[in-house]
């Protein structure tokens, strides 16, 4: 659990596979640069943060807000954002 958010097994795997630092995830969840509630058809919330330590790329963290605790279901560096 990070900052009150539960991580799905897929999210844990993606963190390791993509070398996403726990600090980047914590910062994105606690102080996102952009917050997109209901950003997809499943009603998930997308948290976005520009990570200076990773070439100013944007980290997108997708959270299911309909479960308790809220669950991080996927996270990735979004190449669509500049």
Q: What name fits each language-model region?
A:
Residues 1-82:
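Ribonuclease/tRNase effector modules and their secretory precursors
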């Amino acid at each position: 659990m990070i900052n009150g958010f539960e991580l799905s097994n897929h999210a844990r795997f993606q963190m390791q596979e993509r070398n996403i630092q726990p600090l980047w995830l914590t910062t994105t969840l606690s102080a996102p640069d952009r917050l997109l509630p209901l950003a997809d058809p499943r009603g998930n919330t997308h948290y976005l943060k520009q990570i200076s330590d990773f070439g100013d790329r944007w980290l997108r963290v997708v959270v299911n807000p309909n479960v308790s605790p809220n669950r991080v279901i996927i996270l990735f560096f979004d190449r669509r954002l500049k």
